[in-house]
Amino acid sequence: MSLISTVDDHTQDTASVASGSSATKKKYNPKVYHDDNQPLSKEAMYRAKLKYGVYNSPISGGVGVGVTDYKAATNKAANVANDNQTTVEAYRRLYVDQGAASAALKVGTEPVREKPDVHAEKFKQNRALNLNYTSAAAKALSVGTEKLFTASEEARHAGQKTYSIVSQVSAASTSRAMDMSKVLKGAERKAESRLKERSEPERKEYVKSYSMTAGAAADYGAAGGAAGAAGAAGAASRSIDLNSDVMARVAKRSELPPKQEGPTEKERNAAKFALGAATAVKDLDPKSMLPEDFAAREQQRQEFVRHMTSQKVLSMAREKVDREMASIDKQQAERRLYDNDSYNRAAVAIAQQNYQNKLNAQSEKAGKINIGGGLFLTPQEVDNIAHGLISPVLGEVSERAEAQRAADTEIATRIATYEKDLSNWKNLQRTKQTNDKNVLEVNSKRIALEKQEAKDAAQKKYDEMIKKMDETVAEKKKQLEAAKQRLEDLQEEMNMKLGMQDQKVEEELQKWDENREKDIEAARLEQEELVKPFQDELDEAEKQHEEFLKERDGIDTEITGLQEAIEGHKKKIEIYEGDIRAHDNMHVEEGGKLENLGQNKETLANTLNNDIIILANKTKEQAELSTKQARLKQLEVDAMVNERKSELNQTEIQLKKEKLQLLESMRNKAQARGDEKIDEEKVKGLFGMTSEEYLAKHAPKKEEPAEEKLETVAEEASAMKKEKPTAAAATTAAAAAATTPKKPASAPRAAPAAASPKSEKKRKGSVFDKFFLGPRKAHMIEETRTNQKVAEEKAKMDSVSKPHLVSTTNEHAKPHAAATEEAPKKVDAPKPATEVKSSEAAEDEENKLEHTFSGFSQGSVADDKGTTSGAHSETKKDGYFKEVF
């Protein structure tokens, strides 16, 4: 067993030389294993570290030596050594064939039977015997020195060999006679030196801390005992690795040039490199690699630990732990190693079984020769190894001689054949040159004749083509003249037709333009009639909205003034309360004086009267404060009502605009379809009745003149003034009149339509602008180009009767105009609170709008049933939702 690894399986190379150059190889991959599953000895591990330059620096404190589990250390080392081919190759034990075993047997050495005796003297005898046996094996291995390359080497270099006749002849002529005596002496000398180096390696102290002193050796011997000595002896005796590759490299080294570096030199350089690395580690100062403040921090830590610990506390803790451990041991006595009798019996039985197995394994090796490295062979196997090494050498000599004779015969045969083929080739070349000369003359004459014939044929063909093309050109010219004449006639005819067509088109276009102008003017007048009621309602609603905004601003101003007055009254009340407290104190003092003196009765009565006056003033201020707070609440309610009315007006304005757009879209749709009437189903879905029913229900009424309206409003105002308002109403009216601002304090949420100085005609025109987009003339010209029958379709559209649409829209807009006329009533002097509520309900009832459908949302349509009460109640109005697309 070597210091690093053992190899169970071997690589066996079986070479058989056939026809002088062929070789076969049978190779087994080695497997690393550990025989007895025991760790290496300390000495073996120390020698391995010295050999490979392993040094465990004290700087790396946390890094241990080897692996954590000592049982797996040997297998780990063997696997690492087997994977690292550059370092293991020189020490690996390979297969020793039968020739080596046979040669070792013929030397005359006696086999040594190893016994389980581990005494020191026995160890020396076994080592000497092992050296003799391995020397004999080395002699047997070196017999065939001329055949240095084994079957595996020949297979590797097979691609580099050439087997030409010249190389075989030169190899045969330059080969020297083999001197077996020199080969055997050199092999024996090398083998002995190598065995000595492996069995007794030189100890060099690369690192003093890792060298084994005499005391350490004594400790090791005392601790290890006989078993340790036997293990060391076995490791030293089994550390011999001889193989064919190593022996081949040893013999080849003698034939290399002096300056050429072989595999052994490379291994020596690796050893030097390891030595240099170990020396560098030795010279390394561990303190230089530590941080600068390492010593200071360590001293600080020790000082901290010294202050934090106490010998008394440690002793008490130690005693407590000992007591607890003792109690635990007493409780678990069955688990202790020496107290468990069954465990001890099983351990003794297993130890006896292991010892018996070891004796059986040693008895199997009895009568065998220890070749080294843990290999034991019988004498017959050694004889077979020697025979296998010598026989191939003699067979190779005879095979080379026979191959040389066959090569000489083949050379003579090939030379004769070559000379005969050369003479035939020369005759063939002379005949070829003569034939080439004759062929060139014949070909030149033939090419000249063919060239002249081709030239004559081409000239004749060219003349015929010229004549034919002249005739074609003359005919084409005649056709061109005729085509030009036809083109002129066609142009004159087309110009005449185009002129007539242009004149006709201009006349039709002029007529169509006149008709379109008339139609557009009629449509504009009709649209103005439709939009007029809605425009009037919109103007009235905007005016009413502005009045509501002004009224709201006035209320806001009055609220601000009242709040300031309330703050002033609160301050006065606080002053009066302070005076009351002062008078109370004075009253107490005066009472004491009255009891003591009894003379200032009149002065005391005056003081009491002053207290009563102050209480009266306080009560008065509180009454004024309550009045103004009530007024403030009333104004806030009025402001909220006005704001809601303003929002209602905005909604009504938007509703009217959407109603206008809906009516216009329905009218345009009916005109586009060419219908005589509007779709009655959609009208019914919108108004809840057909157009005829709607006209019958809403008969046209005459509008009152503006002067009559003004008179009616003045009469109502005078009647309201004659009525006796209540005190609250009078106060509200006075406050409203006093706080009416000249300008609005805040802008409305939605800005109303600004009053513009434009004329009524321009304003109506702006309303119609959204129905006519783009220049009218361009639009009419585009329609003329795209459709030739516009005039006929327009005539059909003009024939459609539309009075029902006009009357419907006018009658529908009438109630809204009447409602907006009553709007000025809300800016008169306010009535009492109860009357204000009833008037507001009446105004809501009068100003309510007919629910209609916006073009893109749902709206409720009022039922035919009317409400009997004047107050506005949403619960009494039944409606349904319709959606028209």
UniProtKB/Swiss-Prot annotation:
Source taxon at top rank: Eukaryota
Keywords for this protein: Cell membrane, Membrane
Polar residues: bias regions: 13-23
The keyword GTP-binding is annotated on this UniProt entry: no
Listed transmembrane segments: none
Cellular component GO terms, alphabetical: eisosome; plasma membrane
Membrane topology: Peripheral membrane protein
Pfam family, one: Eisosome1
InterPro entries: Eisosome1
Residue stretches of biased makeup (Basic and acidic residues): 701-725, 779-801, 873-885
GO biological process assignments: eisosome assembly
Comp. bias regions, Low complexity: 726-757
Region (Disordered): 1-39, 695-885
Localization of this protein: Cytoplasmic granule; Cell membrane
Function statement: Required for normal formation of eisosomes, large cytoplasmic protein assemblies that localize to specialized domains on plasma membrane and mark the site of endocytosis.
Family: Belongs to the EIS1 family.
Protein name: Eisosome protein 1
Species: Candida glabrata (strain ATCC 2001 / BCRC 20586 / JCM 3761 / NBRC 0622 / NRRL Y-65 / CBS 138) (Yeast)
Gene name of this polypeptide: EIS1
